[in-house]
């Protein structure tokens, strides 16, 4: 079993190290490639207007553990699968992210987008996040990834060319696991406008997350709030097929347009 690990928190992030330690004896080979610094909320952006620099990642003792990329999480996986790796991995795992990736936030998430890039390149992929900002709680998320890995390989038919698994682990001790759909996540007071010493406005993206749909236990947001691990299958195909069928019924000759 060959696994590619990545993240959006940076090559030396404790979540990535916790994941590597948890899976090291289950994999024949673990490759690691990650950004040179935190690249949260970069979405699926890739770097096209400047060169991308890659170097080996080495600890102070001289042991090298992977590649550092001065690009986005999607850059990392794209480079690994299309250029750097000597062989195609069996699985891409992105995480463990410090902080949740729930609901519509998956569209902003560098963590989920890195897994999506693996999927685009034909490799089954997972994204895993800790719904907490306390680094000491990575142990539970890493242990769940370890328990899940044999199931992922036994039932790998779930991974079509169109689907990845987005996993969110609640803080503390989870009380169970739920299979969920994406919730609807919004932010109250999302833009914080300030004034610099020269009288010019500048802005911070901030805000408190909330779900306008209220508490729904069938969503990833509701599951994590109920202290359950959430597993959500996420599709790369964003086509609305019902709307597509409805458009075909419009009195318009699309072919002649």
UniProtKB/Swiss-Prot annotation:
InterPro entries: SurE, SurE-like_Pase/nucleotidase, SurE-like_sf. It catalyses: a ribonucleoside 5'-phosphate + H2O = a ribonucleoside + phosphate. Binds 1 divalent metal cation per subunit. It is found in: Cytoplasm. One of its GO terms (molecular function) is exopolyphosphatase activity. It is an enzyme of class 3 (hydrolase). Keywords: Cytoplasm, Hydrolase, Metal-binding, Nucleotide-binding. A divalent metal cation binds at residues 8-9, 40, 97. Its EC number is 3.1.3.5. Gene3D superfamilies: Survival protein SurE-like phosphatase/nucleotidase. It holds the Pfam family SurE. Its cofactor is a divalent metal cation. GO terms for cellular component: cytoplasm. It comes from the Bacteria. Belongs to the SurE nucleotidase family. Nucleotidase that shows phosphatase activity on nucleoside 5'-monophosphates. This is 5'-nucleotidase SurE. The gene is surE.
């Amino acid at each position: 079993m060959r696994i590619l690990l990545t993240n959006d928190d940076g090559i030396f992030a404790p979540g990535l190290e916790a994941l590597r330690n948890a899976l090291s004896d289950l994999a024949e080979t673990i490759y690691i490639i990650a950004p040179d610094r935190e690249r949260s909320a970069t979405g699926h952006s890739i770097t096209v207007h400047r060169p991308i620099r890659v170097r080996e990642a080495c600890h102070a003792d001289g042991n090298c553990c992977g590649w550092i990329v001065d690009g986005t999480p999607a850059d990392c996986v794209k480079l690994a699968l299309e250029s750097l790796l000597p062989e195609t991995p069996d699985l891409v795992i992105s995480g463990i992210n410090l902080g949740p990736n729930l609901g519509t936030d998956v569209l902003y998430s560098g963590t989920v987008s890195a897994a999506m890039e693996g999927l685009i390149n034909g490799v089954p992929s997972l994204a895993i996040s800790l719904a907490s900002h306390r680094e000491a709680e990575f142990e539970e998320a890493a242990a769940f990834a370890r328990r899940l890995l044999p199931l992922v390989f036994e039932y790998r038919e779930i991974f079509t060319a169109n689907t990845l698994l987005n996993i969110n682990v609640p803080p503390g001790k989870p009380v169970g696991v739920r299979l969920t759909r994406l919730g609807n996540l919004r932010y109250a007071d999302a833009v914080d406008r300030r004034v610099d010493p020269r009288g010019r406005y500048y802005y911070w993206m901030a805000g408190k997350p909330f779900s306008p749909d209220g508490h729904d236990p069938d969503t990833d947001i509701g599951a994590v709030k109920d202290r359950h691990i959430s597993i959500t299958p996420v599709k790369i195909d964003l086509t609305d097929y019902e709307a597509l069928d409805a458009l075909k019924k419009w009195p318009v000759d699309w072919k002649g347009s």
